[in-house]
Amino acid sequence: MRAVAVAVTAAACVAAYAAPASATDGPQPVVSRGVTIPGFYNPPAELPSANGAVIRHEPLPLGLSLPGLDGRPMPGTATRLMYRSTDSGGQAVAVTGAYIEPSAAWKGSGPRPLVALASGTVGQGDQCAPSLSLQHPLALTPETVSVGYETLAIYRLLSAGVAVVVTDYVGLGTTDRLHTYVNRLDQGHALLDAVRAAHQLPGASITPDSRTGLYGYSQGGGASASAAELQSAYAPDVKLSGTYAGAPPADLTATMKGIDGSALAGALAWSINGFAQADADLRDVVEANVNDAGRAALKDASTMCVGDAIFGFGFTKSSKWTTSGKSLGDVIAAEPKAQAALDRQRIGTLKPTGPVRLATGVQDDIVPHTQARQLAVDWCRKGADVTYDAIVLPNLGDKLLTNHLVPLITDQGDAISWMTDRLSGKGTSSNCWTMPLQP
């Protein structure tokens, strides 16, 4: 059965509920909030031995596509793929995603480059997977709302002639496990292995000499930042030319406080669900401290997309989910083993490979600006090549998501321009020396 590990009671911490299908290629489809997940997303019983090995692939019809003058689809031709990665426990895991071959020519130096894009927060239900959103950019049903808001960044890269591979992350889309939201190792490994998988696809125009970039904002910013840190040890064969990390949740203790009580309070449930699945120390603490309302919320959130979570749990305080009336952050902080487990998720303890552009909105109160800035400081102290960009905007509303989302749009052009310069082989210089003067 499909184990969905939601932190509830000791009797149900590993399988809070089961979907009506096998984790392998069985006859019964998995249905998440009324959406039938294609059988493609059911992992096989046996996985390849090599990280990044392609398990299967198929054509992916893009929901937003037009015929070009030369007959080729614009902005490109997409392939849905499943590939092998390694999770935070060191176990083999199947991950899905998509590769898009652009119709536009690459006009920079060298062969066509590749960007591995890590999506921002989309939810924890399998129907929220970024690869499914490429096919259905706006999915509205009586039970769920999914919006493929990363399409703009993806298509802008494609229009520049850059090939793009998108990861669905561990457990998002694939029906055998729960999505481990903001898990440092899971997301970093999945992004790096997506690069490896893209190079194996038939018909892909990228070559072994193609430059590679990592790109992500919010959850995706954490994933790209993590991947840049992990590359030298986990994937030295992936040659990085640049990494964009926008609004990265590098310090989850601070980020939990920002999310709690916000419009995106449901994301707190996603992180707790994922860590309870992956880490016994956190699971034990959650089981001992979550009340009946909290158990129900964690289970309900585990199949939600962002829109569902905003409607279902917007502005909810996690103190309503605990037996003590304390916030989940305070509960974890009071338990040394649980806090240590959360601290292991900290990004900034390793030097990233290659140049990194880190952007953060100074008014961001969801993924707090201060912890994102601290990541830049931490990297600079390690001698990394960091371009830090503080996005100065007025306060657009406390806890409404606007302070977090608006910089995603306003900074996107500069982020893509910086990335394409790196992919063209242009040099960059760190502005770490300006950090004492930067907000």
Over which residues does each language-model region extend?
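Short, surface-exposed "cap/lid" segments of acyl-processing enzymes
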Residues: 87-96, 100-161
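Primarily recognizes the serine-hydrolase "nucleophile elbow" in alpha/beta-hydrolase
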Residues: 196-267
